[in-house]
């Protein structure tokens, strides 16, 4: 359901959304809410909830309420960005662990850890070196290709994408959620739909604002609300979990020089192509290469200037910035902003 959502939401929002270059798909912040619903009522209720979530988001766009995100104060934005960077950084530590026979996780053996750290270092070095040589080839892709080549042709034993999960599958098919269409069902899904719609729009519109700052252009918030809503309605009918803007992936896209709709649409289409035809190749990519890419994203996302000015700004602003960062790390991005 996550891969289908990544394809459908990614394609629809890249073509019709209000922020060219932004990448959307299934996200962890939405999944946290969805897990509770699925455990209690089943996957079919999730699909109907995603459809209702999309309707709510489209209503926000139609009523032109997307502008409310511009009321978020600058210290909150700084705290959000720094908290995001910390969340991405901490999330990578799971890749340094291995699951034992009893299901518990422990750190990799020292030899495996050294290999992984070395590969991460090579990935990061390539990413920083490539822009000095050429700007016509995405540095993140170059890093992944170089390290994948080293691992595959060097016969290095390290964790790959395929060791964690399979990404192969087929085309999504249209279907009406198999749940009773009555008031009881509505009372079950309505609270979840409102929460998911709020989280999705907050993350998406904050990402729009973030990219606005990077590109020094202005996105269309109401159009993004309409696009996110339409994408979620569609993915609900095709058995997807819904989605919103993916901040980390959007930052990678921006750092790679993408500025137009083609990048997002191509990413979604390539994801589907990989699922259908090239899953075996993707599964051979070392996890270390992906971790290296994300570490570079962390370095580029964190507002290092905020550390220099924190003693110069009003105490209230500094407190808000630190609080938002802390809540972002402890809970999720949407709750921190609220």
PLM features: residue spans?
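Transmembrane helical cores of multi-pass ion-transport proteins
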Residues: 1-338
């Amino acid at each position: 359901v996550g891969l289908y959502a990544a394809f459908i939401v990614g394609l629809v929002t890249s073509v019709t959304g209000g922020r060219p270059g932004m990448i959307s798909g299934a996200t962890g912040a939405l999944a946290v809410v969805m897990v509770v619903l699925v455990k209690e009522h089943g996957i079919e209720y999730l699909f109907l909830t995603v459809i209702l979530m999309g309707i709510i988001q489209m209503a926000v766009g139609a009523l032109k309420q997307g502008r409310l995100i511009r009321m978020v104060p600058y210290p909150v934005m700084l705290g959000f960005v720094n908290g995001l960077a910390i969340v991405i950084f901490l999330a990578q530590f799971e890749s340094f662990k291995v699951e034992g026979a009893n299901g518990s996780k422990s750190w990799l053996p020292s030899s495996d850890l050294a290999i992984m750290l070395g590969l991460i270092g090579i990935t990061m070095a390539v990413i920083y070196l490539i822009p000095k040589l050429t700007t016509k080839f995405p540095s993140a892709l170059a890093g992944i290709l170089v390290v994948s080549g080293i691992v595959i042709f060097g016969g290095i034993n390290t964790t790959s994408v395929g060791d964690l999960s399979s990404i192969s599958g087929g085309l999504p098919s249209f279907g009406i959620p198999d749940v009773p269409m009555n008031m009881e069902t509505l009372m079950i899904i309505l609270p979840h739909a409102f929460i998911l719609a709020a989280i999705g729009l907050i993350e998406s519109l904050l990402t729009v604002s973030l990219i606005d700052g990077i590109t020094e252009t202005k996105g269309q918030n109401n159009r993004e609300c309409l696009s996110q809503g339409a994408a979620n309605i569609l993915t609900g009918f095709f058995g997807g979990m819904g989605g919103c803007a993916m901040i980390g992936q959007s930052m990678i896209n921006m750092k790679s020089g993408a500025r137009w709709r083609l990048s997002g649409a191509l990413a979604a289409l390539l994801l589907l192509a990989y699922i259908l035809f090239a899953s075996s190749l993707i599964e051979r990519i070392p996890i270390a290469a992906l971790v290296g890419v994300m570490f570079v994203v962390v370095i580029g996302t964190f507002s290092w200037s905020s550390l220099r000015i924190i003693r110069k700004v009003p105490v209230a602003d500094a407190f808000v910035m630190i609080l938002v960062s802390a809540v972002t790390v402890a809970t999720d991005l949407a709750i921190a902003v609220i």
